[in-house]
């Protein structure tokens, strides 16, 4: 079951309000959700309210963000977003380091093989 943090549309015709929810990928846009993580009202002066601790929890559990939800979280809970990006960058750096070490070992083996063929 893949999970996404996304916006769920609420409200009336000319006054749309969104809820930030954790939902299964296969559920419809305005359908069933697992947990309410906040809300966003584009028409109000107080635009949004987010539960940053719960968002952080679900992101650590492997939930993915949609583009619009990421923008909203970046504005409303910048600490959560920065920590998420730091973890992603650390993970990428670790993968790059493993690949670099593998390439180095492979080139050394090839050089040794060439050397043994020459001798």
Swiss-Prot record:
Record key words, sorted: Ribonucleoprotein, Ribosomal protein
Family that this chain belongs to: Belongs to the bacterial ribosomal protein bS16 family.
PANTHER family according to UniProt: 30S RIBOSOMAL PROTEIN S16, SMALL RIBOSOMAL SUBUNIT PROTEIN BS16M
Protein name: Small ribosomal subunit protein bS16
NCBIfam families linked to this entry: PRK14522.1 (NF011095), S16 (TIGR00002)
Coiled coil: none
Gene Ontology cellular-component terms listed: cytoplasm; small ribosomal subunit
Gene3D superfamilies associated with the record: 3.30.1320.10
Superkingdom: Bacteria
GO MF, one annotated term: structural constituent of ribosome
GO terms of biological process kind: translation
